[in-house]
Amino acid sequence: MNIQDLGSIGELIAALATLLTLGYLAIQLKQNTSALRSQTFQQSSMDMSLTANSVSSDGELAKIIIKAENGIASLKSDEKLRFHFWMLVAVRRFEAIYIQALYGSIEKERIEGFETSILSLLSNVGNEWWKLTKSAFSSDFTVYADGKINSGKYKVSVHPGASVE
């Protein structure tokens, strides 16, 4: 065996080591992607829960939302302000989830429940607010939300399972 043969064996070993390293990195990348998606879902779930909790823990806010079913004009000025900013937070949180789904950080199937919650709100009690405020959101989100709202799929007034009658 001459030096050229030893050099060829060395190149083969280096190529195999490179392939093993690439395989290892691919496995690590897949695990990291899975962990990122899980973490994104967990954070999204917590954010949406905070939105719901603000209503369940604040009787006055709950009354404002129920009153808003009769239109924004039925609200007093301080109620309009509270309703506006609560809606802004709720919809902004969902917009962030929608964007994460576009980026692939969360699977679209995982956001269906969040989607139903917010779009039910925007289709009914929050519809007037949405028409007045949607310019504050990204244009692609606005097109998406309007398409979903106009589908007529979201019939409940505030949230699936919540009766405010």
Tell me the role of every PLM-derived stretch:
Residues 1-39:
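Membrane-embedded hydrophobic alpha-helical segments
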Residues 5-8, 31-165:
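Amphipathic alpha-helical "stem/stalk" segments
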